């Protein structure tokens, strides 16, 4: 019996982050660029490049609490944006996971208002106040992302991920963390302009997409390589769960063809999220994918969680400071148990795999 494909959420770029957001409204948001936001009592990561030993730059921050878990949960992806480092495999890429226990909203309100005699209607008006000192609509209460139930539509992540975009400018600033919000690493690192991430369900694009552009790209690929991709694909078996078998062919790449065909529905996607699902490979998977190391914290198995997509590359360029990050796709694997020891104050390092873009010009 064919396995059921797990739902996929797509991350898309949206509005710019203004100023230095503080409090839960900052760390319950997902974004591209800027500086990492700290969870309460947990330090922000400050990784260094394994090649040049310089501080890494934040690429994305993803707020993704798991279904049924009592923890807030943040994932950070860092890369070296200096020339020659950003495409030097995973030595220049790092992934970290931070968590902290959620405090029920009602308990928080009661603790802060023990001596107050506010009317019930006032409590209702303020019950969604997350402590932001801006007038923006606060994000909804934390919910869950990634569970065995796969009830993706109910996930708060689809509402919290608000947008992502990078201009051809970069910053070299560090926003101070408000007292008590988290432990920060005061390092001035070149930063990409921060943007929020918004989310859509991949299946929503299936019936409305115009495939003309994708078809023209594939025709060009077939002409240049002198191959018939449909014929190549027929050489491999297909059991419905997208296992992406390795097919030995004289030329052409059926895995790349599948990748192009799948993303044609939403070419602007910069992130694909599918907890414990199947990654969308850009090229035939290497031993790194089949031999993902165990979690360094609990020794348990890691599982695929999300990947960064080629459309993100052009958003991470900077003409001013010469910063650039190049990749085809970045596959992120995290602890399947999402372990977090009591009183843990340091982020847990996770694992990522870099696949280079075999035909970079196709994504321009």
UniProtKB/Swiss-Prot annotation:
Q: Where is this region: Disordered?
A: 125-150
| Gene Ontology CC terms, in alphabetical order | cytoplasm
Q: Which residues carry this modification: N-acetylalanine?
A: 2
Q: Pfam families from the xrefs?
A: PDCD2_C
Keywords for the protein's UniProt record, in alphabetical order: Acetylation, Cell cycle
Q: Indicate whether Cell cycle appears among the record's keywords.
A: yes
Under Gene3D superfamilies, the record lists: YwqG-like
Could you tell me which InterPro entries the record lists for this protein? PDCD2-like_regulator, PDCD2_C
UniProt keyword Flavoprotein, yes or no: no
Lineage top rank: taxon: Eukaryota
Describe the function of this protein: Over-expression suppresses AP1, CREB, NFAT, and NF-kB transcriptional activation, and delays cell cycle progression at S phase.
Q: What is this protein called?
A: Programmed cell death protein 2-like
